[in-house]
């Protein structure tokens, strides 16, 4: 266990940075636009099971925790999400606090790797304050986060509210003589509260103003003259879990991204926005001693547009579903599943030859295997076959551990 903790604490030393450049026709923002199975992969085939999600929400601040979700989405693309939480007591008042998050390429325009490490101190019997930083190699990209948390029931109920100051020292440390007209200040929250009749309310998110930056000196910044970015996200979830293995969950998640860039070379300026709304329900139940049924449904609405470079409008709605049957043994189980997706995609641009509509029905047959190492660790392996597209549907590995 101690070796595991050392290994995962070492992982917290990872981080990334980003730099601006003139865009080209192979625009990352349009990654996934034509992928009719984009949401079928991410939200059905490779989604965390309701039981796993419930345990993660319950224990993410009570214990140290790690979960990894990786699955193939194309012959040359691998979707990988990582969440690592460290809540290590140091004495009666202090805890080491660390969080590493990687959001793989899904519907989001940019992949995110975020690291925050610091300390949490109890100030009353049921509350604490914290301060964390992102020890980025390039100092202009160091983030600072601080906040307050109210805890209850051994930290399994909580209300956490904080503020994240992104690129805290960017004005002084940036290498391009840039000026910041608006700092990126973000409100972050996470809460889990018990309601009546075994229902639980969970929510997390971060909402802020984003940054606005100008680069007045062409000698220091020969390509870009202005850069604004805002990225917000939130989710609300209601879950009910009973002792006989039945569970219900319904949730809404929202994601909004906006980036504006102005370049000194003509013809590259753009104002890009991407908004995704996802409404979902999930149900699981044990039938007898050996059988488990899991039902999942999503409705996704995505709206994106670019003004200027690569001007376009992107309108997408997906209806998704999955039926998962698991045959159970004491420490493991084998899953047979059918997943389906009906996308409705419309892409319009000033040049009508660039326009397209996609609405092909997509479905998968999935074979999976789960093994429970202990009440604190599980792994799932799966492979799938694309029925309507007549091809291999990808393999996936999911792992979740508390320590």
Language model features: what each stretch is:
Residues 365-367, 391-403:
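Outer-membrane beta-barrel "beta-signal"
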Residues 48-50, 70-74, 100-106, 133-139, ...:
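Transmembrane beta-strands of outer-membrane beta-barrel pores
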Residues 92-98, 122-131, 153-160, 196-203, ...:
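Repeated loop/turn-to-beta-strand initiation elements of outer-membrane beta-barrel proteins
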Residues 220-222, 260-269, 294-296, 303-382, ...:
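Outer membrane beta-barrel transmembrane domains
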Residues 107-110, 140-143, 157, 168-174, ...:
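Outer-membrane beta-barrel proteins
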Residues 20-125:
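Outer-membrane beta-barrel initiation region
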Residues 86-88, 119-121, 148-152, 191-199, ...:
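Residue-level signature of outer-membrane beta-barrel architecture
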């Amino acid at each position: 266990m101690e070796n595991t903790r050392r290994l995962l604490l070492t992982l917290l030393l990872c981080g990334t940075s980003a730099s601006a450049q003139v865009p080209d026709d192979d625009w990352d923002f349009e990654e996934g636009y034509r992928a009719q199975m984009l949401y079928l992969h991410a939200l059905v085939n490779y989604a965390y099971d309701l039981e796993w999600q419930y345990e993660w929400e319950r224990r993410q601040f009570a214990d140290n925790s790690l979960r990894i979700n990786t699955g193939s989405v194309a012959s040359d693309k691998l979707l990988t999400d990582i969440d690592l939480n460290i809540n290590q007591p140091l004495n009666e008042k202090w805890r080491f606090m660390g969080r590493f998050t990687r959001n793989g390429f899904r519907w989001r325009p940019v992949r995110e790797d975020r690291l925050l490490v610091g300390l949490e101190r109890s100030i009353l019997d049921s509350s604490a304050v914290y301060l964390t930083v992102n020890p980025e190699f390039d100092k202009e990209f160091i983030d600072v986060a601080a906040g307050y948390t109210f805890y209850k029931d051994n930290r399994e109920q909580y209300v956490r509210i904080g503020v994240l100051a992104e690129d805290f020292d960017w004005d002084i440390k940036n290498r391009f003589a840039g000026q910041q007209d608006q700092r990126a200040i973000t409100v972050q929250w996470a809460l889990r509260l018990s309601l009546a009749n075994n229902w639980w309310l969970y929510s997390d998110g971060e909402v802020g103003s984003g940054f606005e930056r100008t680069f007045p000196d062409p000698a220091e910044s020969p390509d870009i003259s202005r850069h604004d970015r805002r990225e917000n996200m939130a989710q609300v979830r209601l879950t009910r879990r009973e002792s006989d293995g039945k569970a219900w969950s319904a949730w809404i998640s929202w994601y909004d991204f906006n980036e504006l860039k102005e370049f000194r070379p003509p013809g590259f300026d753009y104002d890009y926005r991407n908004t995704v709304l996802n409404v979902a329900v999930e149900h699981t139940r044990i039938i007898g001693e050996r059988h488990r049924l899991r039902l999942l449904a999503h409705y996704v609405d995505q709206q994106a547009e670019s003004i200027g470079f690569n001007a376009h409008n992107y309108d997408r709605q997906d209806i998704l579903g999955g039926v998962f049957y698991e045959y159970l043994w004491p420490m493991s189980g084998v899953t047979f599943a059918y997943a389906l997706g009906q996308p409705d995609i419309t892409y319009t641009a000033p040049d009508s030859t660039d326009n397209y509509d996609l609405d092909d029905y997509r479905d998968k047959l999935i074979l999976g295997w789960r093994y429970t190492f202990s009440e604190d660790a599980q792994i799932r392996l799966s492979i799938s076959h694309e029925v309507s597209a007549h091809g291999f549907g990808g393999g996936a590995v999911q792992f979740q551990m508390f320590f």
